[in-house]
Amino acid sequence: MKPKIVCLCGSSRFADIMAVIAWLLERDEGAITMGLHLLPQWYPGVPKHHLAEAEGVAEQMDELHLRKIDLADEIFVIDWTDYIGESTAKEIQYAKDNGVPIRYLTHESKYIGFICDAEQGAKE
């Protein structure tokens, strides 16, 4: 059976959670995941937030992300702390307009539990 393709959508402030969810979806559901990719802080000239804006390519990256949604069987919204930013809201609307099913992290108790447990373990 062909694996489903999942496009991860969410704020770059949740890139760490996005990476964990990508791993869990691939491990537990056999899905292929696509999402945003951030450069590490040690990469020359990387600002703390919004690299695409700093490099003047935000519009290009936003458009590319919509193409990822076009390829996806569903989107998975990383709405940690119930936060959905402007870009993510546009991606959700785009998915709705194009009939792409939408899942939300906050509605996925097994993944929420995993993230909460992992965060708690990291603090101990």
Give the label of every model feature segment:
Residues M1-E124:
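Conserved catalytic or regulatory cores that recognize and/or transform ribose-phosphate-containing ligands
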